[in-house]
């Protein structure tokens, strides 16, 4: 099974080697036909502490690193 890759915005970088990434998901509600925005926060591993609040990054699923971290930061996302 391939690893999932998500794109989001760093909302916190206060912890050592960890960033919190807010990932927003948009979809059309099947009954109401209205666009719905859902967001979720993921804690991701950032070994060099190089990402700061406001950066747009890509995170990739990985083996558990700690109790709450199951994602690692891959790169800066290219903003198109």
From Swiss-Prot:
The keyword RNA-binding appears for this protein: yes
InterPro entries associated with the record: NA-bd_OB-fold, Ribosomal_uS17, Ribosomal_uS17_bact/chlr
Classification via Gene3D superfamilies: Nucleic acid-binding proteins
Entry's Gene Ontology cellular component terms: cytosolic small ribosomal subunit
GO-annotated molecular function: rRNA binding; structural constituent of ribosome
GO-annotated biological processes: translation
Keywords linked to the UniProt accession: Ribonucleoprotein, Ribosomal protein, RNA-binding, rRNA-binding
Assigned protein family: Belongs to the universal ribosomal protein uS17 family.
UniProt function note: One of the primary rRNA binding proteins, it binds specifically to the 5'-end of 16S ribosomal RNA.
Assembly description: Part of the 30S ribosomal subunit.
Family matches, as PANTHER family: 40S RIBOSOMAL PROTEIN S11 FAMILY MEMBER, SMALL RIBOSOMAL SUBUNIT PROTEIN US17M
Name of the protein described by the UniProt record: Small ribosomal subunit protein uS17
Organism: Cereibacter sphaeroides (strain ATCC 17023 / DSM 158 / JCM 6121 / CCUG 31486 / LMG 2827 / NBRC 12203 / NCIMB 8253 / ATH 2.4.1.)
